Amino acid sequence: MTILVGTASWTDKTLIESHAFYPPNCNSAEARLRYYTGIFPLVEVDSSYYGMPSASNSALWAERTPAGFVFDVKAFRLFTGHQTEPKCLPKDIQADLPKTDKKNLYYNDVPAPLLEVLWARFFAALEPLRAAGKLGAVLFQFPHWVTATPKSMAHVEHCAERARPLLTAFEFRHESWFNEKHRESTLQMEREHGIVHVIVDAPSDVKNRVHSLWEATSPALAIVRLHGRNAQTWSGAGSAAERFNYDYGDEELEELASPIRD
């Protein structure tokens, strides 16, 4: 068994501005990535959640990293049911959208032909990483308002089919997916589609979280994501940096290491 450890993004603004990780001479995207790969063998690309990724960037990432380095890539926010401002879409897609006064769009607000284009472009953008053997899992994070209903299950399975044959991971943010009624059916769905079940560590006594369920649903991979245990900022209106601002202690890490090894 191989265990890879990495961070969610190597270009996070707060990480760079903290001056706690990168040395002073790492002041370009290339330098930061090359330095990062000397510390960690894995990274999660989160820029692909906020905007569509590009093949040119993927090619540069593949070129600037050593053999065996792995990129997990977050799925674009529109695909996972998140609200998406039109400006987050490519300009040609924006131009072809139906006229609307909505500030935010959701998946079903976008015409099917345009969705086809977005899916195709998303996976084409990952091709340089796949071809280089450096693409890990494509991570779909479903927000807490995507609950375990037949409609949501249909969309989740739709995402699984669209991502095939790439290795795909699902992270659910609403507890209904793993409550007594739906836990087994959710895990069975993941197994049937070869989906990697994402195990989440987060504050224990807060809303809008799924409690850790230590299950492996894919023979290829298991993912554990550490969100931190900062209960005070978890449900607040602050930034993501504030929400996830947490340093795990040695005892907490050892507590997590045991089930990971198992």
What function would you assign to each model-found segment?
Residues 1-262:
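Residues lining hydrophobic/aromatic ligand-binding pockets adjacent to catalytic sites
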